[in-house]
Amino acid sequence: MGKEIINVIGPVNEKTFLSVGSKVLELTKTPEKEVIVVISSNGGSVTMGLGIYDLLKVLPNPKEVLICGSCISIATIIALVAPVEKRYMTKNSIFAIHSSSVSGDHMSFDYSHLNTELSFMNGNHARLKKIYLSETKLSEKKIDKALFYDSLTIFSYEKCLKKGIVGKVLESTCDIF
């Protein structure tokens, strides 16, 4: 019985959520089957990412995470679904946290919605901070700095090991497949 792969490749959006969700439903029928979540993503929707995190967290199957390439923004939260000793990254991968921004998807911004959007962002920050605190060795100060003040905080593989973000750095992905 081989390992089942769940890919989080590319942007985190509704399509990614649906893809992961259908795979999770399928895997609930075989809770003994090992799952590898392969991540190479620059992030995307915080809401969809938290949904993916929640789906994977309740999946009873044993989980491993492989960061191969970029793991940025909300993808970093998804990467924390497995126990630290089951989280891996390749040497050439990056892990980066950044501060959120107000959505500016349209040319003119309706400022009457700013308070609602800021309140929503603060709620998301609290949820993200709680996950980083419980799943890594990052200090509250470092998390606050990354989420609220820095435009981008990049972690090398060495720092990921030291801070409990990953448990092992792989020379080759063959080491886990």
At which residue positions do the language-model features occur?
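Terminal-region recognition feature
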Residues: 1-177
